[in-house]
Amino acid sequence: MAAGYRAEDDYDYLFKVVLIGDSGVGKSNLLSRFTRNEFSLESKSTIGVEFATRSLQVDGKVVKAQIWDTAGQERYRAITSAYYRGAVGALLVYDVTRHSTFENVERWLKELRDHTDPNIVVMLVGNKSDLRHLVAVQTDEGKAFAERESLYFMETSALESTNVENAFAEVLTQIYRIVSKRSVEAGDDAGSGPGKGEKINIKDDVSAVKKGGCCSG
């Protein structure tokens, strides 16, 4: 195969990442900004579930992200189990201009951990950082919650494309590092690890990026 050429579906790893958080916090625009570099001011609530994909290079490997998005309204809770199944990363999103969306982050995190391995790679995202004059959730508040729960943290603006790439890339990089570390520890010189293009379900290996481990609540 010629160096430098890769077909669209030629990837080394496939990671499922879910977007969670209240309705209206900008999950769909984060998804469209990252996967298509698009933003819609007239965003309608997502009906049911949609997902988009994008591939990134991480340490010379092609990592394909399958990113799932659903509306945050309670009436969609019936799809919860299928939505979370197999997810190895999550962006937990709140709107920095609406404090109630930040208050609900704890409930979303509990739901996430109820349906996935508790060591899933999670990035707490304070979106709409471009609306500086309307900020209701201070950066320190988000940072403190993230540190308490061993989450990663970034503030983003899907509108201005601020930190959107960084947030997704950080989650994918951390997942990849856990997977590659596991392969090295298992003596994966003979190619006994996951096959090319295989979807990875990290389970307990994600604990490698946690600072203080995880306690059962």
From Swiss-Prot:
The keyword Lipoprotein applies. GO terms for cellular component: endomembrane system; plasma membrane. It is a lipid-anchor. Pfam families: Ras (PF00071). PROSITE patterns: RAB. Keywords: Cell membrane, GTP-binding, Lipoprotein, Membrane, Nucleotide-binding, Prenylation. SUPFAM superfamilies: P-loop containing nucleoside triphosphate hydrolases. One of its GO terms (molecular function) is GTP binding. SMART domains: RAB (SM00175), RAN (SM00176), RAS (SM00173), RHO (SM00174). One of its GO terms (biological process) is intracellular protein transport. It is found in: Cell membrane. Belongs to the small GTPase superfamily. Rab family. Possesses GTPase activity. This is Ras-related protein RIC2.
